[in-house]
Structures are given as C-alpha cells and as structure tokens.
Amino acid sequence: MSKIKPLSKSSQDLSLLTSDIASFASSIGLASALPSSGFNDTDFRKPAKSKTQKRKKPKKDQQHKDEDEEGEPKSNIGNEKGKDFGARKQNKDAPVKQTLQPKPKPGFLSIDDESTGYKKKRFDEFKSLPKLPLVKASLLSSEWYNDAAEFEEKVFGGRKVAVANKEDFKGVVEKKRELGERLMWQYAEDFATSKGKGGDMKMVISAQKSGTVADKITAFEIMVGENPIANMRSLDALLGMVTSKVGKRFAFKGLKALSEILIRLLPDRKLKSLLQRPLNIIPENKDGYSLLLFWYWEDCLKQRYERFVTALDESSKDMLPELKDKALKTIYFMLTSKSEQERKLLVSLVNKLGDPQNKSASNADYHLTNLLADHPNMKAVVIDEVDSFLFRPHLGLRAKYHAVNFLSQIRLSHKGEDPKVAKRLIDVYFALFKVLTTEANRKQGADDKGAADKKKSNPKDTKQEVSTDSPIELDSRILSALLTGVNRAFPYVSTDEADDIIESQTPVLFKLVHSANFNVGVQSLMLLDKISSKNKIVSDRFYRALYSKLLLPSAMNSSKAEMFIGLLLRAMKNDINIKRVAAFSKRVLQVALQQPPQYACGCLFLLSEVLKSRPPLWKMVVQRESVEEEEDIEHFEDVIEGDDVDPNKKAENDENVVEVDHDGVEKSSRDGDSSSDDEEALAIRLSDEEDDNASDDSEELIRNETPQLEEVMEVSNDMEKRSQPPMRPSSLPGGYDPRHREPSYCNADRASWWELGVLSKHAHPSVATMAGTLLSGTNIVYNGNPLNDLSLTAFLDKFMEKKPKQNTWHGGSQIEPSKKLDMSNRVIGAEILSLAEGDVAPEDLVFHKFYVNKMTSTKQSKKKKKKKLPEEEAAEELYDVNDGDGGENYDSDVEFEAGDESDNEEIENMLDDVDDNAVEEEGGEYDYDDLDGVAGEDDEELVADVSDAEMDTDMDMDLIDDEDDNNVDDDGTGDGGDDDSDGDDGRSKKKKKEKRKRKSPFASLEEYKHLIDQDEKEDSKTKRKATSEPTKKKKKKKSKASE
Amino acid sequence: MGKLGKKARKFAKKNLQSVEKRSRKLKPFIKKKFAKRNERHQAGDKQEKKVEQQPKKRCQEEEFQDIAIDAVFGKDDDEVLRDGDSDSDGYLDELVNETDSDIMKCKVLSRSFLATCCDMVDKEQYVPALVRLLNWYRAACQYGHEPSGIARPNIYYDIEDSETFAKVIIFVLQKADHTFRSILGLSDSSTKEKILKLKNNPKWDSLKPLVKSFFRSTLHLVKQAGDLEIISFTLTQLRVSIVFLAAFPDLLKKLIKISVHLWVTGEETISQQAFLILKDISMVFNSECFDSCLINMYKAFLHDCDIPKANSEQRPFLRDSLVELCSQDVQKSYTKASVSITQLAKLLKMALATKNKEAVEKIHSGEYINCVDLWVNFISANVQDCDLQPLLYTIVQVINGVAQLIIGPRYLLLRVKCIHWLNHLSRTSGIFIPIASLVLDMLEYKTTNDGEKQEQKLEAVSTVKLPKNWLKSQNFQEQCIFSVIELLAVHFAQWSFHISFPDLATIPVMRLKKFHERSTMEGLKRVVKRFIEQVESNIEFVQRKRDDVTFSPNDQQSADTFMQLEKQNANAPYTQYYQSIIDKALGTNKKKKK
C-alpha cells in the first residue's frame, strides 16, 4: 500500500534524497494513509504486527534523520534560500497581490475555470515548471491537520522552532506562498489525474458545472470531502454562495453545507498563517514541500474561514429573520466547536443581544448561555464582551435588558476563577446601574414633565414630587434583572472584595428599597440582607424598611411574595432584638388577617418557623398579655403618675399612666384635624428628629410611601407631652403601638397574638388548622409550599379532579430548570380515599368527605338494587332516623345520595344545557401547551406583564434556592457539594418529629430518583445545583425552616 | 330525509341515529299542525282518534304552552265525562253551533239548576249531581279554549251567564275537596298514606274519575285563565286537595310544571301561591317529588335570570323561596348544591385559565351570579343548624375567585356583590372571611375628579360591567367610597367585640388614613374620617377591655366569651354607627329600587 512513487519527478532538485529517506517516506505514507489521527502512540499500537515490525525500522531511521536535521538547520536555511531565490525567479512575473488574494474572482456558484484569465496563465506557468516532489493527493487522511502534524514532526522532529521575526521574513513568506500555490496546483493536478478519473468523480464534476443548486452544493461538498486541499476551489465556490449579495436562498443552503464542511476541516487548535511558520528552515525535499503545501493550505483555509465568519456576521444582521436565526445558530455552533476566529464570532453573537427583535435577542441569550455551559472557561471573555456591548453608546434599553438578563443567568461557583468573575459581574451591574440613573437624570433635566415612558426609576428623582409615579414597566424590569444578577453573583465574591462592594453600594441599594415597584424593593432588601448577614451588621434601617414593606398592599399580590416571605423569615430569625421580632410577628399576623388564605398560611407557617428559633415568643401565644415590666424596656412611660382608672390590676399602674399620656395624644390629634398645617409641621419636625437618630436620609421617602404619617403625628404629640385631662382612655396602653415606624419601639413584645383567635375561625380550613396548631402551642408541620398548594387554582384543580397537564418546561434558565413538577404530586379525585381521614390535609378534607360519600352511596345504591328486602328497608329507615339529628354523620348524605344518583345526573345535564355546553368544552380549552407557548413568547417580550411575572418567579425560586446554599455555607459547612444531603437529613429528622404528620400524598423519593441522579451529575459540574422539583419543593420549605 | 333513496334511508337509520331522533321529534309537530287544522274543519270521531294517537308520542317532550298536551288529558277527560254523561239529563240533545257567548242560545246551565245541584252536592254529597257539576265545571274551565260543541257533538255544555260561570267555578273549587273527603269518609288532615290505601276502598273506584276530572279541569283553568285573581284563588283552593294527587302522578307532575312556571313568571301573589303549592307538594310527597320540584324551580330560576326583566325585585323573592324549599331538606339540597357549585367552580376555572372573553362573560352573566347568590343564601340560612362546612368553604373559594378574576373599577359592582356575599356568609356562619384587602383595593382605583357630575345612579345599570365613561364621574368615586365604608362597616360590626378586633382593624385603618390624606374631595374625606374615628374608638374600647383579661390567646373559650355581655347591648357608639351605616345603605338601596 505504501507504494509511493517517490522521486520520479523531482529528481533534479532533490538529488540529496537518498533511498533511506525514500523508505522513510514510504513508512510515513503508510502512517498517513491510516485513517486514525495524529502522530501519536496510537499509530504504534494499532497497526498489525507486520506493519509494526516494518515501522520499527523507519522509526529508528527517523531518529537518525532527526539527529541529522538537528545538526543542519542552518545549512538547510542556506540551501533553502538559494532555492527560494530560484523559485522566485521562476515565478517572477506572477504578481504578489495575486497570492494575497487567493480568490480574486468571486465566481458565483462555479469553480473558476482554469481556462480563464491570468490564473490560467499562472497555472500554465506552473505547468511549464517541473514538478516538485510532493506527497500524493490520494494519500490524504480524513483529517488533513494530522497529516500536517506528521509532516511537521518529520521535518522538525518535534522541536520547537522559533519563528524568525525579521523584516526580511516577509519576503521569504511571499516566496514560499508562491511556492505553496504552485505546490497546491500541482497537488490538485495530481488529484485530478489520480482520483478524478473515476466515474463517480466525473459525475460529481459534471454536477458541479451543470446541476441544480442543490446538486452543485452537494457536489462541492463531496469534492471538498474527498480532498479539501486539492479542491479548494470548490470551497471557494461555496463561500461565494454565502458571501454573495444576490441570492439569499443560496446563502441559506450554503451556510449549512459550509459550516458542516468547515467543522470537519478545522483542527481543534487555531489556524496559523504562513507568517507564523518557520518558513525559513523548511527543507527543500519532498517532506519539506509537502509540509509547505499543508502550511499554505492552512493559510488559505484561515483566510477562507475568516471570510466565512464575516459572511456569517453579515447574515446575522440580515433582514430576513430566518436567515438571521440560522446564522446565529451557526455562529454558536462554530463558536462552541472550534476556536478559530472565536473572538469575531463571540462579538457577533453578543452583538445579537441588541437585536431589535426580541426573539433573536433572546436566542442570542440562549446561545450564549449554552456556550458558557459548554465552555465554562470562557466566562471571563464573554462577560468582557458583554460588558463592552453594554456600555456602547446609544444602546437601547431592551438590549441592555437582554444583556443583563443573560449575565444574571450565568452560573457561578466558589471554585477557580469564579469569585473574580462574580466580582466582575457585580462591577458591571453597578456600573450599568449608574449609567441608567444618570441617563434618567439627564432625561429629566431635558424635559421636566415628559419622558414618562422612558424614565428610569431613579429614587433620587422620584423622591420628592413624583414618588407616587410608578416607574415604567421596562424600567423596573431591568432594575429587577440587575438586582437578580447582583443577588446571584454576590455570594460568590470573595470576602475582602465583598466588603468594598458593600461600602460603595449600600446607599444605592437603600435608594432602591424605596422604589415604588415592590419587586425592586424586595430584591434590594434581599441583597441588603445578604450583605448584612455576611457582615453581621444588621442595620436598623434595613429592618425599618422591611417593616414598612409589610404594609404595602402589593406585598402579597406580587410575584415576589414567596421571596418576600423567605426574606422575612431570614431577617426575623437572624434578628437578635426580640422586641423587633415581636413587632414583626404582630404585623405579619395582621397582614395574615387581610390576605387570601394561601398567604395567611404562608404567614402562619413563617411564624411557626420563627417560633422554633425564638422560643421566647411562645409566651405571646400561651401567656396573657404581659403586664409586668421588663428591665430592658424604655422607661419613658414610667415617668408620669396617673389616677387609677382600673384599679383592680396592680401591674396595670404604669400602663394607665401611659394611657393618660395617650389621651393627650388622642386629643391633640383630634385638634390636629382642624389645623392640619400644624400637624404637618409637627410631623416634619419629628421626622427630622428621627432622621437624626437613625441617620436615615431616605426617611422622608418612607414617610411618603407608607401610611404612617398618622403614627408620626402621634409620636410627635407624645413627645410634646401635651398633657390634657383624660377625655377617654386611649388605646396603646404603654405598650403595643402597631403604627410605629420603628419596629423595635412598637413594644410588640407585650402584646399577645390575639390574631390567632380570629384566624382559627378562618373560612379556609388550612388557615384555621394552622392557627389552631399554633394556639395549641405546637409548631406547624407542613411539607409543601402553601402559596402554591392552597392557591385558588390548585383548589379548582382538585375540585375538578383534574390532574393538571404536565407541561414541559421549555426555555427557562439552566439555574432553574423546572418548577412546575409539583402539580403531579397532588392527590386528585378518588385517590384521596386511599388516605385515612386524619391524614388528609385540612384543605382537602372537603374532597375527602365528598368522595367518601360518593363511594358509599354508589355501593349502597347497588346494594339496594340487588335486594330490597323489607328488613333492610326498615333498617335503612332506622338509619335515616338516626341521621336526622346528627349533622356530623356523613352517612346521612350517603343515604340521600343513594336515591339521588339519577337526579345528580339530571342536574348536571340541566346545568350543562344552561351553560351552553361550556363545561363540555373544557377538555379542549385547557391546552396548557398552547398557553405555555403564549407565555413563552411573552417571555421574550420585554413589555409584557405576564412574562414579567413568570420570569420573576423563576428567579425567585432560584434565589430562594441560592439562599439555602448560602446559608448552609454561612453556617460553616462550607462545602457546597454536601448541601443537598445535609438538607435531606435534616428534613427527614424533622419529618420524624412531626406530630401531626400527614401521610405524604406526594410520590415517594424513588420516583424521582432519576431526577436526583441528574442533579448529582450537575453537582459535580458546578457547586450550585439545580435541584429537581420534588426535592426543591421541600427544600423551599426547608430553606425557610433551616434558615 | 324525504329525498333520500331507499338505501340511503336504510343507511341513515342504521348509522345516523341523531337524524332519526330528530325526525322523530319533528314528526309530531308536523302532524299536530295538520291535526289542528283538521280539527277545525271537520269534526268527528275519526279525527279525534288521530288526535289521541299523537299525544302519546309527544309525551316525551311536553311543553307548557303546547296545546297538544291538553289533548293527552282530553282523552281521559272524555272517558270520565262520558261516565258522568250517562247520568245527566236531557240537555245533551241540544246542539248549538254558534258559540257566541253573549247570545247564549243554549241555556244548558241555568242559575236555578246550578243552585239545586250545588245544594245537593253540598248537603247530601249526591254523586250524580257532583258528576254533573264537575262536567259544568269542566266546561267552564275549558271555556273559550275548546271549540265547544264541535269536539263532542253529542254533548254540549254551555253556561248561562257570567255569574253562573263564576259560581260553578267557585263552588267546585271551594267544596270539591270537602265533598270528596266526606264521600270517602276522610278527615281533612289525612295523609298521603291514607290516600294510597284508598285503592282498596270501593268508593274510591267510583270517585276516582271525578277527582281526576276535577284536577284536570282545575289545572287547565290555572294554566289558561287570564285573570290573576282566578288563578290565585284556584291555587289557594288547590292546595287543600294536593294530597289526592298522590293517586295521579302524571297530574302531579303537571301541576309541578305549571306551578313552577307560575312561580317564575307570575305576579307577586300568584308567584307566592305557586310557591306554596310547590312547597306543599315537596312536603307531602316523597323525595322524588321534592327533587323534581327543586330541579324544576332551580332550572326556571336560572333561566329566568337570563331574561332581562323590568321587575327585578321579584328575583330576591324567587331566590328566597327557592332557598326556603331547599331548607326543607337540607341533606338533599346539599348534594344538589355541591353539584351546582362544582359547575360554578368549573366555569371559574375556565375563566381563570383562559381569561378569554367568553369565559369571563359567563362569569359575569346574571345566571352565574344568581346561582352563587342562591347558594350563598341557602348556606347562610342553614349553616347554623347543619354541617355545611364543605359547601361553605367551596363557595367562599369560588366567590374569592370571582372577586379577583378581573380587577378593575369597571367591575366594581360585581366585586361589591362578592364582598356582600362573603360578609353575609361570615355573619351567618360565624367564621372569619378576610375581605379587607378586597375592599381596600377599591380605594386604589385611579379615578379622576374632573368628570362632571353624572345624573344617573349607578344602580340603574343592570349589567355587571360599568360603562367606561362613568368611571370618571365623581358619582362613581363616591359610590366607591361609600361601598368601601359600608362593606367594612358590616365586616367590623361582626367582629367589633371580638378580642382581636384591634389587630383586625389595624391595617385597614392605616390604609384608610392613607387614602384620607391623599384624597382631595372634601365630602368623601369627611365620611372616611368619621369612619376612621369610629373604628379607632372601637379599637380602643376593645383594647382597654383586653388589657384587663387574665387569659392568654390560646385559651379559646375565654376568648370566645370575651365581651359577650357588651355585645348584647348595642349602645356602644360605634355599634350604633355601624348600624347607621348599614341601615343607610339598606335605605338607599330601597330608595333606588323604588
């Protein structure tokens, strides 16, 4: 097989080639003919025995030769120079430009025929020249670069050859380039004569010349696949298709073909141009020429690839969205698979984030995320690129939003470079934030009243006069994305750097806290909490802000409710000031009284968790309102003496005193009604005072934003101590003041949790049960997310006995792969009967009863039909009588239902009629997939409300997850990898402890094993694991529990 | 199907069941048309037979106003009457073709004769006289509706003058029941069982046709009479003899249908009378009757809701009477209610899921709202005595869903209604239903004050959705605030003596204060201010009392007895205040109705 006809044609020039080299060359030929790659040990392992024996000798030879060559590079150079000059003389008349532009004529969809133009002349020239010794075209392996590497190895023997960096080197390069061209021509000729004679090839060639576009493309593909070096013209033709400005349909087809070809052609390293090669030391023998050929080819390929990338970039900016998408995909594809031109590719990919079309922009986002998943090392580079993209002038908000969104989705870890990356990210975020705010400033300066639609929410601006104006949608979204990003990245910043960030950024965050948008506020509070928990400095200001946030009606309506509750829990648990915790608890209870059941449950559960870590709070439940003074209470209320209105309680004394005091307050505030100016002044003065205390510069804002002006007034009056005769006893007797702005001064620790009394009468059974549980002095045990489980939709789903369709979670971030799995865990319909009544969750009890009735009634009716003996009837009657008085007895229903089966049907039928069959249609109407599709589209729409919510929730979930991680870390576990298992252990222990445990209606762990396994895999990759839903759901609870 | 070939027809019969069914349905109509026309043109037994046959088919889908239904019973009538005819005197021979009522050429029934008949029946329970009387009664009932004299050429009953006419009817209606009973030897209070036992009584066999005839004629009268007083009187008298209907299930069904129809469509008194009948029926007879009453009424009620009517004040009566009926057998109604509420929930779910216009419209339809209204009232009427917890829970959830389905000032009325319901449920059941946030959200409606004062009252709108231009009116804003105050007042009034009232009211008061600051309308500000003051004084009061207590929150019993004494006397200023607001709201509602 290795019958290389070595020296027949190159006899004159290479007389120095000896027979041993010929044999060596043949052995190399053998190696190169092997399909396997590279000049590595596989070559030694793989071939059959005979070959290895054969090889051993050449190996030695090679070593010899290497030694030889080592000795004589200089002389070689000298020789070469001479040769080069000779060669140059030979090609003297060929213009240099020609070589620089290997493709002068962009022949569209045709190989440039050798019969045209000066190229032909050149080739004619080449024809006239003697043939140089060269590797045979037919011997090319499937990966040319392996062959090239082999030749390199052969020529230089694996030494590193420094590239000469002289000026005159260029000249050498030019010469060699010409030589390379000649060699390539010769090579192509060789290919044409050897292989091109085959029938297949002929057909292919004819297809190239006269075929449909598809044919031509395929033909080109085949040619290039056959031997890329010899068929560079085919490659050029394909490139021409793509770069051509004329036909986009060619571009469509060409892009795919070309990208496939190029993926095959490109090595895993970067391509080198001729300039980077040690051309001056290349020997002028067959190997040398062959190597030169390969180098030249590589150079050509590099140029072509560059053109291809340029073309890609261009078509990614095309008008046609399809072409754009295709180009984008190809860019991503090329970028992930090959490193050549990665910079350019990356730039154009990042650039697509600014695409005016949301779809393309989010595609770019998606591709970038995937890219980082494939090549985590590229994070820094990509972030830099996005950074420079972000701060381009005149960049639209939308583009910024997409960019920030992408950045915030980057996965981070504590290992390696990631802390630095995180730091970098945070810098970017804050820099962007600054830009946004200054822009807003400028805009506001430009036109005072207008710019409402584009206004960035800048608390500084909105503070005074426009504080009621809600920041515009887009704006809050980008802010929210920014904050999400910061929240995510912050935990990964190394500690010392974190301090700097805190130092510089806290004021900004506090401004954000008071943004009119609740979500923004919560997220910044979240971040503040994170910061402060890291530093162990929990500022009063933070708590005050949080406390006031509780009052906002949107607190529970927003998509961030879950996050907010999580934040509250953490804040309350970490708080050392028990009075403040008490104040928070009271207010949480009051909020629970106002909100829909699921939030009430959330609040109660939150309190239960707080109670676990703050057992002293129990006394607010189980003890009467504390009247005895505690030593750490401020003593201002002890000062004044008062007449005993209620003399029966001895400890009441000082409270009564305060009552007197408060009478004055009441009175004065009543007076204040008439003279509101006066009050206003007082209020402002007071707020000033308070500002002094708390050094809070945004105090005024709080005052405006939260309905606490009244309270301020009262306090101010209090301070005035305008004592007046007690008209009537006032509330707030020395103790709890629900309206105080500063939670630690509310004296909430003296108030009992009377709210539980009302809550235990709540219409929703779960709320009632939870409140009852707390009242009985035990902790609530609940494995679920009340916000989801008890929501109205969940209720309706259960009511309809409908297992919600399992919707596939598409898109989404990698951090949060899925969150909708939990629906499948529900016990639906008659399945609920498998549980004992005691195990059924309170909110499901209704259904349980319902099905119990249903089951027994059907049984009974059957029985009845079967045999209707008089005794039985009598017994039934008796039964009936018994039921008459016992309302609790559900068998009575059964009895009735037994007779009513048909009636039920009738009613149902009738109702159906009445409803115009609306109900019947429901099967068709609940296409969740469709809905999802819509939602997905919305997701990409920056303006859409819905997507906002969706996106936000994703992030929430994730954030909570994150927190969990962080907390475990903070607790000193340190090792993130163990988080999961730790959590699980804790959970199982907790489970055992459960008193009122409900038998889990959820599927067993085994069913989710595959998911968990998946997680583990992911864990190994990154520290931050994306927990699958079932664990996650519990985990969320857990996060509340454990924090 | 007429044009199809034989094979095609065969195929259709085999495979297109629905077509077959429809054609079956259509046929009687067509035939009936012919029949009626024929009836007019050619009298005769032949024709009669034909008429008799069709009704059997028609029985499947009998309708109220369908004359063909009469024919069904007409056939039986003939039998009965023929029996009686044999006893009648020679008046039968007289045939008069002219039916002009004023001329009355054939004086078949004279005043004097009637008097004697009545006398005989009244005093001696003389059966032949009764038979004759019933024949006349029948004729009177059918008067003007039956082509008299033609259908039965050999017998013809006519009535002398309007006085006689009235007397026949009145006498029969008044005395029939008593007469039947005395003939059968029953007391006035005999039960259904006794009636059923009559089967073995030989007297019954002879009397049965008479009773049947009486009912049939009466039903006809009720259905056809134009005069409200007659109907009303008839219904009243009919009530007494309802027990006899146990023997005639068909007639019973018919009566139910008629009564339901009257109940829904009739005037106030008739409606009431009809309801009383229905109630009696459901009380006297077995559960099946109760069900059919309930279902029919329910259906009719909901159907009625769709029809925009001028007198919408009757709807509460309908609802209340239906509730009353349901309350008779709570357990049975319970299952009906749960089925119905499931339907409501289904619709709600659909609306929530799709948010498309039709689904939402469905929620806002009068039908849906009235259905909710019905069950809310049912539950609140019975929740004290029975365990309706599941129903309560589900309906509260549904109402909450409806209230939050579409948020916006345009749906203010619906929301107010929802909160009313919740308040109602909460008050009657004693459970806590959080409404404050729902109410207070109404304060946030962004309305402008620049709109000129609108003349119309909001309540004039029958639709749930308000027209857009109203939203800007000052009137609307006032209405918003007044509703808020009213709803909150109801809510607070319920809990005003509860130990956790101070905490309950804290946040609403805060939000109201905020609104008070923000608002620019002086009139509204004053109202709000006053409300805040009252609530605060209430808070203080409870707080003061609470400070004295010695028990802890987990002592539920003590907490429940807390301030029970104070609750009894409604002299507390804020209680009076709440009451005044509620009364005022009621007053304005009433005023608006008028």
UniProtKB/Swiss-Prot annotation, chain A:
- List the ranges annotated as motif Nuclear localization signal 1: 44-51
Entry's localization field: Nucleus; Nucleus, Nucleolus
Keywords attached to this Swiss-Prot or TrEMBL record, sorted alphabetically, are: Nucleus
> Got a GO cellular component term for this one?
nucleolus
Annotated motif Nuclear localization signal 2, positions: 441-448
Short sequence motif named Nuclear localization signal 3, residue ranges: 1022-1029
Question: In which residue ranges is the amino acid composition biased (Basic residues)?
Answer: 47-59, 988-1000, 1032-1043
Which residues, if any, are the signal sequence?
A: none
Which portions of the sequence form the region Disordered?
Answer: 32-113, 444-469, 632-737, 861-1043
Question: Which regions are flagged for Acidic residues bias?
Answer: 632-645, 688-699, 872-983
Q: From the record, what ranges are coiled-coil?
A: none
Tissues where the protein occurs: Mainly expressed in actively dividing tissues (e.g. root tips, lateral root primordia, shoot apices, young leaves, inflorescences and pollen grains) through the plant, including roots, stems, leaves, inflorescences, siliques and seedlings, and in gametophytes.
Deletion phenotype, per the entry, is:
Female gametophyte mutant with impaired progression of the mitotic cycles and lost synchrony of female gametophyte development leading to an arrest of female gametophytes at the two-, four-, or eight-nucleate stage and characterized by unfused polar nuclei. Defective pollen development.
Q: Name one GO biological process term.
A: embryo sac development
Q: Where is the composition biased (Basic and acidic residues)?
A: 80-95, 444-466, 646-673, 1006-1031
Q: Which family does it belong to?
A: Belongs to the CBF/MAK21 family.
- Function of the protein: Together with NOC2, probably involved in pre-ribosome export from the nucleus to the cytoplasm. Required for coordinated cell cycle progression during female gametophyte and pollen development.
Q: How does it assemble?
A: Interacts with RBL in both the nucleolus and nucleoplasm. Binds to NOC2.
Q: What is this protein called?
A: Protein SLOW WALKER 2
Q: Which organism is it from?
A: Arabidopsis thaliana (Mouse-ear cress)
Q: Which gene encodes it?
A: SWA2
From Swiss-Prot, chain B:
**What effect on the protein does mutating A8T have, as reported in its record?**
In rbl-1; indeterminate flowers in crc-1 background
**Placement of sequence motif Nuclear localization signal 1:** 8-15
Q: Which family does it belong to?
A: Belongs to the NOC2 family.
Q: Where is the composition biased (Basic and acidic residues)?
A: 36-58
Q: Which InterPro entries match?
A: Noc2
Q: When this gene is knocked out, what is seen?
A: Plants lacking both CRC and RBL exhibit strong floral meristem (FM) indeterminacy with reiterations of extra floral whorls in the center of the flower associated with reduced AGAMOUS and SUPERMAN levels.
Q: Which example biological process does GO assign this protein? A: floral meristem determinacy
Chain span(s) of sequence motif Nuclear localization signal 2: 35-42
Q: Which organism is it from?
A: Arabidopsis thaliana
Q: Supply the gene name.
A: RBL
> Mind telling me what this protein is named?
Protein REBELOTE
* Function (record text): Collaboratively with CYP40/SQN and ULT1, influences floral meristem (FM) determinacy in an AGAMOUS and SUPERMAN-dependent manner, thus contributing to the floral developmental homeostasis.
What is the tissue specificity? Expressed at low levels in roots, shoots, leaves, stems, inflorescences, flowers and siliques, with highest levels dividing tissues.
> How is the quaternary structure described?
Interacts with SWA2, NOC2 and NOC3 in both the nucleolus and nucleoplasm. Binds to ENAP1 and OBE1.
GO CC terms, sorted: nucleolus; nucleoplasm; nucleus
Quote additional remarks: 'Rebelote' means once again in French.
Q: Which domain of life is it from?
A: Eukaryota
Which intervals of this chain are the motif Nuclear localization signal 3? 512-519
Q: Where is this region: Disordered?
A: 1-21, 35-58
